């Protein structure tokens, strides 16, 4: 009986901490971005070229440079000389940002159903922004 209450307190504290960490990772730090304020680029011949897009949905978090995610439809073709990106690795985003499915994008990149291009190099040291382009 003497150890039950402290054990119960420890278990409840662990569950509360786990819920807090989960919430912070899924919802706490992310912000939806205004589509008008999102600048989409692709590197072509060593220079960033702006991309025109519609249906832009984007999220970001101040806590990490790798939390930026966006889904969009290009309104035109990629510019001549767009730089392909070798070995892209889509990172999993929050579940509620349903337009971005990292697993599907990874599968499509590996199968050739989508192509990866360098969007913006060195957003932060060793962090590149990459876009996956589908043929449609």
Where are these predicted regions, by residue range?
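N-terminal export/targeting and maturation segments
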Residues: 4-81
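Aromatic- and glycine-enriched beta-alpha-beta binding-site module
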Residues: 35, 132-134
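Mature extracytoplasmic domains of secretory-pathway proteins
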Residues: 57-123
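C-terminal partner/receptor-binding element of secreted or periplasmic proteins
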Residues: 125-128, 135-136
């Amino acid at each position: 009986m003497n150890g039950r209450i402290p054990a119960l307190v420890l278990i409840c504290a662990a569950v509360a901490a786990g819920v807090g960490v989960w919430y912070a990772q899924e919802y706490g730090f992310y912000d939806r971005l205004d589509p008008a304020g999102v600048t989409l680029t692709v590197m072509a011949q060593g220079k960033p070229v702006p991309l025109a897009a519609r249906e832009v949905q984007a999220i970001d978090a101040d806590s990490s440079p790798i939390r930026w995610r966006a889904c969009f439809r290009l309104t035109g073709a990629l510019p001549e000389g767009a730089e392909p990106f070798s070995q892209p690795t889509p990172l999993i985003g929050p579940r509620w940002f349903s337009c971005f499915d990292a697993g599907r994008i990874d599968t499509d990149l590996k199968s050739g159903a989508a192509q990866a291009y360098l969007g913006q190099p060195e957003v932060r040291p060793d962090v590149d922004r990459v876009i996956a382009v589908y043929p449609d």
